[in-house]
């Protein structure tokens, strides 16, 4: 590189650093060789973390911290994500999971160009079912929040979109999940508390999903 261009490059970088613009540069495109769903899981974790932070700030007079809420897992006894996604070297008895009645989702881009083991198929299928359950709950909850005269808080549409993107990546044939309708008059106070509970639980699950995708990317 000629001296003039080198000086120009250095000057540009110094200026960016001085103006603190370097931190706001676009995120690099994922490596083509990266496990396809890792990028989606990273986006999911970022989106739900941002939404949880927003909820805690907006609902500051509600019990919305991890110490104040009653922790609840809506996927309990319905999916086996934690067990199914254990690394093979930590799985002592795969036959226990084999005996489960499970329908596999194996036609998404997450499995593109990969040999699919039973455990990987079970793991990704379970993650898909988790996302589907949370998607239904969030859509139903958002419909109630939109009815609130105070219009205090709504779910971030980016988070809902990221959930849908990961579901599509796990299953090309994924259909739009209908939201549950309710004839009851919404209790907005309880709905907002429920939102905090759901966001805390979903962030924990998003951390698990991201770690699974990171492990699969490295394996």
Curated annotation (Swiss-Prot):
SUPFAM superfamilies attached to this UniProt entry: 4-helical cytokines
Compartments it resides in: Secreted
Record keywords: Cytokine, Disulfide bond, Glycoprotein, Growth factor, Host-virus interaction, Secreted, Signal
Annotated S-S bridges: 37-110, 64-196, 85-123
Pfam families reported in the protein's UniProt record: IL12
Protein name, UniProt field: Interleukin-12 subunit alpha
Positions glycosylated per UniProt: 93, 107
PANTHER family (UniProt xref): INTERLEUKIN-12 SUBUNIT ALPHA, INTERLEUKIN-12 SUBUNIT BETA-RELATED
Function of the protein: Heterodimerizes with IL12B to form the IL-12 cytokine or with EBI3/IL27B to form the IL-35 cytokine. IL-12 is primarily produced by professional antigen-presenting cells (APCs) such as B-cells and dendritic cells (DCs) as well as macrophages and granulocytes and regulates T-cell and natural killer-cell responses, induces the production of interferon-gamma (IFN-gamma), favors the differentiation of T-helper 1 (Th1) cells and is an important link between innate resistance and adaptive immunity.
GO molecular function terms attached to this record: cytokine activity; growth factor activity; interleukin-12 beta subunit binding; interleukin-12 receptor binding; interleukin-27 binding; protein heterodimerization activity
Similarity field: Belongs to the IL-6 superfamily.
Organism field: Homo sapiens
Matching InterPro entries: 4_helix_cytokine-like_core, IL-12, IL-12_alpha
Organism domain of life: Eukaryota
Chief location bin: secreted
Subunit composition and interactions: Heterodimer with IL12B; disulfide-linked. This heterodimer is known as interleukin IL-12. Heterodimer with EBI3/IL27B; not disulfide-linked. This heterodimer is known as interleukin IL-35. Interacts with NBR1; this interaction promotes IL-12 secretion.
Induction: (Microbial infection) By pathogenic organisms, including Gram- positive and Gram-negative bacteria, parasites, viruses, and fungi. Down-regulated in response to enterovirus 71 (EV71) infection.
Cleaved signal peptide residues: 1-22
CC terms in the record's Gene Ontology section: endoplasmic reticulum lumen; extracellular region; extracellular space; interleukin-12 complex; late endosome lumen
A GO BP entry: interleukin-12-mediated signaling pathway
Keyword Zinc: no
